[in-house]
């Protein structure tokens, strides 16, 4: 929730007072004071007001968590719904609109009688179900698959509890909207969209009613709410304010939202009475109780109405939300990936090797994650106490996903023979639908293999490996680091035994401040910055040499949301005074630790380079103790005419390189020309969402130390105690991918998949078994088609397979479903999301929507 420019004519003090009073105050239906219509009858209407129509949308916006706990949010839902039902009993044509399947799930569990009452009003058409999602989430930070699940569990829950689904998607309070949403929304059974942010002062659009077109060509009819989704004051004044700018709009019909919100409440008695009075007022526009469904039906039926088409994303509002509260954001990324991986392995495992697919537990885990994606939670703009709630919720989801994955792989491992008692065995599993080559780490009892160890795959081919310090201080266990190929969505057994290790001509070494392999020379400066030299191309990756990953400090006095901020540019320092230490020196991997400091904070980055690799990996440990400052990592890529590409939910977007703060998913790429040839750098990470690019300087936002739930215009007393965000230790990983080909040609989305959902290794005991020592269950032949989800259907025992085109290029692809003895071949248009439903018994494969129908 952001209240900036959101309260119409009311003051912030009145808004906060209203939120604190809550819906119990609203239910009393005051008719004087703050909620009074005052002298509205004396306000003259514009001469042409009668030409316009106002669909009055009774609404009570509910933030289930924000300046209050989720427990209070549950109470707000109940009291707001009670108030709406009471108003319906009093006024026969009053209508009420609300979203969020989670709210109705709470009502179903705690007040079945109220749910039955709501269902009757839904059947009458007076209770308008909108949204179709589990909650109103952030619309930039969740992954594409999480947005799919918002609608899957939201729509199915609405239908189960209330007998119908939403046809209007709505996220009025979210802080920006990715341009891939139209396809997702439409494939969830909704044709229309409502938003409010960014407002007119943040993004200029040709009309508040328009066709929003996604990069795949899907369009949804979209409406931007004027002024606010809350109206606690004069209904007439609100309508007049909208009419003041109506001549610039192509339509004659508008939606007029009214009702107390944020802390719930809904329509008041006085606002309902004022609307009834306006129905007969001379010179007034047509004003009537209505629903969002009715509004969109009316404007769609107007065949003369010509509306603009917008193909952009809808940004920006409150850019600090991309970075605030690092732990919530990292746990969100980890939970999304863990649940997807668990579903993939257990769904196919249930059909092939008898693994358990814990359907109810997966649904529960997803619903917990989806709730925590509510915009004030995932954006980091809630009160401090919510951090613990979020930590527990993500832990719940990660535990369910982890246990399901472990037990399924154990079931597989027990059936793959590992019979030599003088050897140790690992089974490594690749959860992606393409072959990969990966470096695997696993702590083992090193024992007699300390001086003489050989590692082979299941065919007896030797594998390059090395030993590094393990995770214990007992001396008996070391970490085995081994490089191996793993088949597409499949597994391979590797064996460690006493013997001569593989001696490779292609090794890697580290000495002093330099590490080097066949392709790259990596060096570090006295300030801790990195230089990468491409030995094949004879080029430096960074402008000026060793200038990459400068840890830049920016003055950031903004509030939690960073209201009125477009970019973070006031640099006041940088981490420096580096100490450099070699940690590993081949033959498979070199690793150098670079420690720097700034103020009361310290930064340690373990940079690693593997034999034969063209990428540089970093494990970052930040101990942050700054206040009202921001940390960004700067990568000045040595290119001209730079083009910046950001991953967004189930897609990517090219944005201008003007330094503005932008949201992104796992990767950002900056490509251009250098001396007549192509060059570029992609940075992939497993935890961050805020980025900026100015010219050729690409930056990742690492930490913001604002105060929890601090909202302008409140001025902080710097002599008082405050709860500061992002303090202490945080860790995350990055992968730097320099390239001469385009990011599409080297398949950056696939590399990001492998980096953020790495292959899994499991220890094998000594036993027999009937399954082969390697196998592949599923693969796709087109590099720009990612298999993003494999799961059991929500109804029945079919297999759901979701694929996404990642490069923006149409392609014909073949899915080899070896686990089912079947294949599927079909065409993908650019950016298309395609969902297949496989009947494992009949082998029938059909294309379905995102609701699996």
Q: Which residues are covered by each model-predicted region?
A:
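N-terminal secretory signal peptides and thylakoid transit peptides that target proteins
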Residues: 2-23
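Catalytic alpha-helical scaffold of carbohydrate-active enzymes acting on polysaccharides/glycoconjugates
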Residues: 49-54, 79-91, 107-165, 176-187, ...
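C-terminal (or distal) subdomains of carbohydrate-active enzymes
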Residues: 181-184, 206-209, 276, 281-286, ...
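C-terminal segment of N-terminal export signals and the immediately downstream linker at the start
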Residues: 8, 30-53
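An acidic-aromatic substrate-binding cleft motif
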Residues: 45-67, 185, 513-524
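The substrate-binding groove and active-site-proximal loops of carbohydrate-active enzymes
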Residues: 63-75, 100-107, 132-147, 165-175, ...
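Alpha-helical scaffold elements lining the catalytic groove of polysaccharide deacetylases
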Residues: 139-160, 226-246, 590
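Catalytic grooves of carbohydrate-active enzymes
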Residues: 65, 218-418, 431-433, 595, ...
């Amino acid at each position: 929730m952001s209240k900036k420019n959101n309260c119409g004519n009311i003051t912030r003090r009145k808004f906060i007072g209203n939120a604190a009073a809550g819906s119990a105050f609203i239910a009393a239906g005051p008719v004087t004071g703050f909620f009074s219509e005052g002298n509205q009858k004396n306000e003259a209407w514009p001469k042409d007001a009668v030409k316009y129509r106002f669909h009055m949308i009774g609404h009570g916006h509910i933030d289930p968590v924000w300046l209050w706990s989720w427990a209070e949010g549950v109470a707000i839902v109940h009291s707001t719904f009670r108030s709406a039902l009471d108003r319906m009993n009093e006024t026969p044509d009053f209508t009420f609109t609300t979203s969020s399947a989670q709210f109705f799930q709470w009502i179903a569990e705690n007040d079945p009688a109220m749910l039955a009452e709501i269902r009757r009003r839904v059947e009458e058409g007076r209770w308008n179900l909108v949204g179709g999602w589990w909650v109103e989430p952030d619309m930039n930070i969740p992954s594409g698959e999480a947005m799919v699940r918002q609608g899957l569990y939201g729509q199915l829950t609405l239908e189960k509890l209330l007998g119908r689904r939403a046809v209007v998607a709505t996220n009025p309070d979210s802080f920006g909207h990715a341009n891939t949403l139209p396809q997702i929304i439409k494939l969830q059974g909704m044709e229309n969209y409502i938003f409010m942010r960014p407002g007119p002062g943040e993004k200029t659009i040709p009309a508040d009613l328009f066709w929003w077109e996604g990069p795949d060509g899907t369009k949804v009819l979209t409406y931007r709410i004027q002024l606010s989704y809350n109206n606690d004051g004069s209904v007439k004044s609100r309508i007049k304010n909208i009419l003041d700018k109506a001549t610039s709009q192509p339509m004659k019909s508008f939606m007029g939202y009214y009702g107390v919100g944020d802390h719930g409440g809904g329509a008041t008695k006085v606002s309902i009475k004022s609307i009834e009075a306006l129905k007969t007022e001379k010179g007034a526009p047509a004003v009537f109780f209505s629903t969002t469904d009715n509004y969109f039906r009316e404007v769609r039926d107007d065949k003369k109405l010509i509306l603009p088409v917008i193909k952009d994303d809808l940004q920006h509002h409150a850019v600090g939300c991309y970075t605030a509260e690092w732990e919530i954001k990292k746990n969100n990324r980890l939970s999304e990936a863990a649940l997807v991986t668990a579903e993939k392995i257990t769904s196919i495992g249930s059909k092939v090797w008898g693994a358990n697919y814990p359907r109810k537990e997966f649904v529960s885990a997803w619903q917990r994650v989806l709730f925590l994606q509510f915009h004030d939670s995932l954006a980091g703009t809630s009160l401090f106490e919510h951090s613990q709630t979020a930590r527990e919720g993500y832990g719940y989801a990660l535990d369910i996903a982890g246990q399901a994955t472990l037990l399924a792989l154990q079931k597989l491992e027990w059936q793959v023979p590992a019979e030599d008692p003088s050897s140790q065995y690992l089974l490594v599993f690749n959860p992606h639908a393409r072959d990969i080559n990966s470096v695997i780490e696993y702590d083992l009892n090193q024992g007699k293999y300390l001086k003489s160890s050989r590692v082979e795959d299941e065919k007896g081919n030797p594998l390059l490996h090395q030993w590094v310090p393990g995770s214990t201080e007992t001396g008996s266990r070391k970490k085995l680091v081994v490089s191996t190929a793993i088949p597409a969505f499949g597994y391979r057994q590797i064996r460690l035994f006493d013997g001569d290790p593989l001696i490779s001509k292609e090794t890697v070494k580290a000495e002093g401040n330099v590490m080097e392999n066949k392709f790259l020379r990596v060096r570090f400066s006295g300030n801790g910055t990195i230089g990468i030299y491409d030995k094949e191309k004879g080029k430096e990756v960074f402008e000026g040499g060793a200038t990459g990953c400068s840890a830049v400090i920016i003055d950031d006095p903004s509030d939690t949301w960073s209201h009125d901020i477009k970019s973070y540019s006031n640099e006041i320092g940088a981490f420096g005074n580096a100490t450099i230490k070699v940690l590993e020196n081949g033959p498979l991997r070199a690793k150098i630790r670079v420690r720097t400091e700034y103020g009361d904070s310290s930064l340690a980055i373990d940079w690693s380079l593997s034999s034969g690799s063209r990428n540089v990996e970093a494990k970052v440990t930040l101990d942050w103790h700054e206040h009202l400052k921001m940390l960004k990592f700067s990568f000045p890529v040595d290119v001209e005419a730079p083009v910046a590409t950001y991953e967004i939910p189930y897609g990517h977007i090219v944005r201008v390189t003007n330094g503005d703060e932008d949201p992104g998913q796992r990767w950002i790429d900056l490509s251009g020309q250098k001396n007549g040839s192509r060059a570029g750098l992609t940075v992939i990470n497993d935890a961050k969402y805020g980025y900026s690019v100015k010219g050729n300087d690409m930056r990742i936002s690492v930490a913001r130390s604002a105060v929890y739930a601090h909202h302008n215009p409140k001025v902080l007393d710097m002599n008082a105690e405050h709860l500061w965000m992002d303090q202490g230790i945080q860790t995350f990983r990055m992968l730097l991918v320099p390239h001469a080909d385009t990011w599409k040609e080297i398949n950056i989305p696939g590399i990001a998949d492998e980096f953020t959902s790495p292959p899994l290794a499991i220890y094998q005991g000594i036993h027999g078994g009937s399954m082969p020592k390697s196998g592949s269950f599923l693969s796709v032949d087109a590099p720009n088609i990612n298999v993003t989800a494999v799961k059991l259907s929500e109804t029945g025992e079919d297999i759901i397979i979701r694929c996404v085109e990642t490069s923006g290029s149409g392609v014909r692809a073949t899915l080899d479903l070896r686990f089912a003895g079947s294949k599927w071949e079909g065409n993908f248009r650019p950016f298309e999301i395609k969902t297949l439903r496989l009947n494992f018994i009949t082998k029938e494969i059909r294309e379905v929507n995102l609701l699996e129908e």
